[in-house]
């Protein structure tokens, strides 16, 4: 009888031994976290600047001028260029907070699944999603507090009279208001609640101006990705769900994360760190997740708030 030499390595099916080996390896857990593409921080999309902190706090400049402190002059041939100073804004300091929790995953929960990895995926996703929700809530509150420019809607997006719904007017006027500041802001993002998002898709004026013969129409996709060249982001974590924000995400601010290289943690692309800890006395695993971060708003003028967009 023919046989292979050397013998092939033994293979493992989706049993408890396989899952245990997976959870004990941070590299494998990290690779698995990359598959959770539907989990994403809204905060990281609105505050795109990134800073690293090692001392538990981050120092940043608020409302930094976008021009130098000297008027540009005509320079004669052969003359030296005049020096100008790069003005700085008001210094701000934010303390890093560690947001985290853990859940218990028993061996019985794993083995009683027809596909044991489902139990691990569900537990990991819930831990990561809970951290996302908390960090997003804190970041959105920070943005909402910092934004001071606001105006009432021209016509609420869910107005009982369809003709009085004016989301496009609100958006275009908001973009104009930011540009009128002449501070270099370029609006690129619209942030709305799920209800406002729905009425944005239902609006007749916007629907009539969109391309008709295309498969990216909201009637097919259930999504509206851009309006007036703004990326539309839907989140239930707005501090006031009846309002909408127009922001310049490149200028608004950022997130400062702290990494301490603690052993056993798998770090995902989301900046969430996850660690699996075996509890032999309980025949279970602790799945522990955390993110050490703080949001900071550098340019309050890079945000514009529209009030009363929905009831």
What label would you give each PLM region?
Residues 31-101:
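Assembly/oligomerization interface modules of large self-assembling protein complexes
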Residues 86-151, 183, 190, 279-294:
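Long, contiguous amphipathic alpha-helices that act as assembly "spine/axial" helices in icosahedral shell
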Residues 109, 196-198, 238, 293:
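Short loop/turn segments at secondary-structure transitions that flank enzyme active sites
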Residues 104-108, 191-196, 248, 299:
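Helix N-cap / beta->alpha transition motif
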Residues 2-30, 203-311:
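Sequence/fold signature of self-assembling virion shell proteins
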Residues 147-220:
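Extended, solvent-exposed, turn-rich assembly/linker loops in the middle of proteins
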Residues 39-45, 52, 133-140, 184, ...:
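Intrinsically disordered or highly flexible coil/loop and linker segments, enriched in small
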